[in-house]
Design a protein with these regions (language model features):
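Substrate-gating cap/lid region and adjacent catalytic-acid/histidine neighborhood
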Residues: 32-226, 235, 242, 330-332
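Compositionally biased, low-structure terminal segments
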Residues: 2-3, 59, 128, 140, ...
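Charged, glycine/proline-rich intrinsically disordered loops and linkers
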Residues: 20-44, 51, 289-310, 316
Length: 333
């Protein structure tokens, strides 16, 4: 529960159930509801939930969604339900928690720009075709923090956990290619950049992506893009053959090393027009990103920072990051 000493979320499943108990008049207040819920086994809880009116359930979630607009509360996206995700959560700290096979983790540098381009606080879509970015700096900032947050969950945390558990063959990458062309006022290198799914035509080698390739590739950038694609296919093929991408099938690429606790961690995949293919020793931690965001002078207002954090914490399970969010954004709630 949120008022326990151990950090929790104001809209955790237990908090929601307690609100439902009060809403259905099964308990007179949240304190009584918390006690009642703790005394229930899973079958009693199931019976209670199945007996609730649908309107009561929607009422609680609508109230949460309304306050979410103020950057105050949220519903977690990652649920340790014991079926899809183990009750222990997304953890790889022991070898018994995963299948011990060679693994590649990877994300794109600007993952969330694909979704932000469709609709966000700083952009809009006209006629489902034309994209208008109203504030490029804030648009980029939103993507920067959200994409880093994605990388923490999908790459850095599992890589660290597996390496710390004794696993050796953990590889990671970040796709950075962002050389798309322009159409009218739309600069797709800024609107999309290295967004979600942009790596697909490079991995497959088709240089096609549901028609989007018309705006991705042109006579100027295609030759270098193809060279990057050939390199990526070579790495992927070598990994499939041997479990180690190494220097690719022809042994002529920069070596893709495993994640190292004290050294290089992931491979940056970019064209020679930019930084090329190179290893990086940079890593991300959720609490550090949350603190960096709250100290970021580019974001002027604390309530805007809390709106950012509100979205980021929905994918967080680290207690220190959740505590930081609660302290900065939920005081007085």
């Amino acid at each position: 529960f949120f008022d326990n000493k151990e950090s929790s979320l104001l809209t955790s499943s237990k908090e929601v159930v307690s609100k439902l108990l009060v809403s259905s008049e099964s308990s007179k207040d949240l304190f009584e509801a918390n006690i009642a819920q703790d005394s229930m086994n899973e079958f009693k809880l199931l019976e209670l939930m199945q007996g609730l009116d649908l309107g009561q359930i929607f009422k609680v979630y609508k109230a949460i969604d309304k306050s979410k607009q103020d950057g105050k509360k949220m519903i977690p996206r990652v649920l340790s339900d014991g079926h899809v995700i183990p009750k222990r959560g997304i953890k790889f700290s022991r070898k018994s928690f995963y299948n011990d096979v060679p693994v590649i983790f990877g994300t794109n540098r600007d993952e969330t720009k694909l979704f932000n381009a469709i609709e966000s606080d700083y952009s809009t879509s006209l006629f489902n075709r034309l994209i208008v970015v109203r504030n490029q700096e804030m648009y980029d900032l939103t993507a920067e923090y959200a994409s880093n947050n994605w990388k923490i969950s999908a790459v850095d945390n599992p890589s660290r956990d597996m390496i710390n558990s004794g696993k050796k063959d953990v590889f990671a990458y970040r796709f950075d290619w962002d050389e798309q062309g322009k159409l009218l006022w739309m600069d797709f290198s800024k609107i999309f950049g290295a967004a979600h799914a942009m790596e697909i035509p490079f991995v497959t080698g088709t240089m096609k992506l549901l028609g989007i390739e018309r705006f991705m590739f042109n006579d100027e950038n295609l030759p270098d893009a193809i060279r990057l694609s050939i390199a990526m296919q070579s790495y992927w093929a070598e990994f499939a053959y041997t479990g180690d991408p190494g220097k690719g099938r022809d042994n002529n690429l920069p070596r893709w090393n495993t994640w190292s606790s004290s050294g290089e961690k992931f491979l940056i995949l970019d064209s020679q027009n930019d930084q090329g293919i190179v290893m990086s020793d940079f890593e991300l931690r959720r609490i550090d990103e949350f603190k960096r965001l709250f100290a970021d002078s580019r974001i002027k207002k604390d309530d805007t920072k809390c709106k950012f954090l509100n979205n980021l914490v929905q994918n967080a399970y680290e207690k220190d990051a959740i505590s930081f969010y609660n302290e900065k954004c939920l005081q007085g709630e």
